[in-house]
């Protein structure tokens, strides 16, 4: 048997030593971890899982830390203060890495698509033409490499500084789009809104002239929300509209050659491979949307978002040419990037301007118009019908709510159409009261606006978000009239309390009826009623007037002061002034009931005999 060479023996010995050292370290680490509190152990393990092991190290057992020199890392972790999650530097690092990876992937995909779609000669010529003042010194490739060297923010600002003509050239637009993190997309859309005014050549057909109105109305962030809701086929068709529209340039002289490029790219995109690329990209976008969405955009209820998705898909599916809404692009971009801040079924007041209501009502109408033909054309009739069904209720509600002229027919809607619609929006602006009024399902507290008593009665009672009577804020329904009652309220002591409580004023309801007065546990609190002297603020503890079950069944009357004082007998002359002479005959009639009551009132009213006052004098 051949002897093992010397170098191999040395290698084996060194490996054994290393393994023994690693085992010893792991053992020490395990002991340390077992003595550590659970939260600290969890922190260490999470951090190790995030960082991952470098390839040269042997993988340690699951309960241990990294092999290699662990001491500096460990001390840093153990001394670290546990603050809010979004400030944790490990989590921030992880987020940055994820964003960088996503941006790289999307850049690669975008560049592949561009290479597949573009005709190099045309595109280079157009780019040279787009910025003649500045770009003479470099070829497109040099410019691209220089832009890649810049950080995304610098590149974006530099492009913004150059001006409108340059930035709507296709390649910078798309590369800027995909270099941004989703959070930056919104402010970009608002800043670009002024620069992106599409000038259309008079020679173009209305179909071509209407096409640019579509990409503006979906600011990038909203476009992502929409695409995450659409079925894959829908998003595929929408990509058609968007990628074409990204190629539009404001130069009216070049519209003819653009139409050629557009048709060519449409034809290519309809082929199978390109559609697969688009679908993959849509999938990636869906993954990226969910973490990247801004809370502002999700204020609407899910129903609202699906409605947006349905509306924009039906408008964007390859037939934006029929879409009659070329309103001012910049303003619409700003408005839509804020998100529609209204929900369909809640009773909150909508934050909408009249112009918003106009565009919204026009959008659903055009969406309804186009759902049928588009579904048939794209071969996805069922999906579109389902969307239309889900959309039906919100649409009808919207159209009833917004009293807006229906959009222009597609034939007239050229550039003149946009002017007319801007004028309509201007006319709509002065009376904001009609669209802003909330829908009927959430009525406020049921009182006429001019009735001060009822407004005082329902003070602090908020109308709930749904249909129904207002909720009461406390446990009891407190009657609180501060004005003097009308003269009809001065009644004889024999008048039952229910009649007192339901005295009608001159056409207005002054008191709640007997059904509205809530008696809880046998106690009724009427502040400032004819039964109680003194202000309710001072005596609110003493104003609980007690009933017994038998007395409630038989009568609603209270003993007069004179009878109670005769029974107690401390000062018989005091009640003569307040108690009227009319009280005497009634007392004689009702003696049996009063005897019943007096037995029960002896304990309760012995100390506070003067609280009950039947004269109703204010």
Curated annotation (Swiss-Prot):
Pfam families: Phostensin, Phostensin_N. Residues 429-451, 572-583 have a biased composition (Pro residues). Residues 96-109, 308-319, 485-505 have a biased composition (Low complexity). The modification Phosphoserine is found at residues 54, 131, 139, 181, 201, 231, 437, 535. Residues 15-505, 556-594 are annotated as: Disordered. InterPro entries: Phostensin/Taperin_N_dom, Phostensin/Taperin_PP1-bd_dom, PPP1R18/Tprn. The modification N6-acetyllysine is found at residue 462. It is found in: Cytoplasm, Cytoskeleton. Residues 585-594 have a biased composition (Acidic residues). Coiled coil: none annotated. The modification Phosphothreonine is found at residue 205. One of its GO terms (molecular function) is phosphatase binding. Transmembrane segments: none annotated. Its main location: cytoplasm. Interacts with Protein phosphatase 1 (PP1). May target protein phosphatase 1 to F-actin cytoskeleton. This is Phostensin. The lineage of its organism: Eukaryota, Metazoa, Chordata, Craniata, Vertebrata. The gene is PPP1R18.
